[in-house]
């Protein structure tokens, strides 16, 4: 697999069984830094969802002409083998909002 880049949206296999045929896949954005992505076999991702909720951890997104949200309260660590294929990248404004909210979530304030 090519280098996994931060802020790239992938179709991800979220099914508990890795070696079987994927039954549960959804788009997720990679939020782990490129330095981690380069050296580790895992990535940190947040799922995209079309089910909107008014939460401070949600980032609005219009990806592939579909409105939705990035659910930062549902971040998870996955093995890179679960990344099925890249779907695109986040725009600059969306990236900035993801970084801002992650900073608030983990700043301890």
Predicted regions and their residues:
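Conserved functional hotspots at enzyme active or ligand-binding sites that engage polyanionic ligands
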Residues: 1-109
């Amino acid at each position: 697999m090519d280098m996994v880049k931060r802020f790239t949206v992938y179709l991800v296999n979220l099914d508990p069984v890795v070696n079987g045929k994927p039954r549960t896949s959804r788009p997720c954005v990679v939020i782990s830094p490129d330095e981690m992505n380069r050296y580790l076999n895992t990535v940190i991702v947040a799922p995209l969802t079309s089910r909107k909720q008014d939460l401070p951890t949600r980032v609005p997104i219009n990806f592939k002409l579909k409105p939705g949200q990035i659910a930062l309260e549902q971040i998870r660590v996955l093995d890179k083998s679960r990344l099925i294929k890249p779907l695109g990248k986040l725009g600059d404004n969306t990236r900035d909002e993801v970084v801002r909210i992650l900073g608030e979530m983990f700043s301890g304030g």
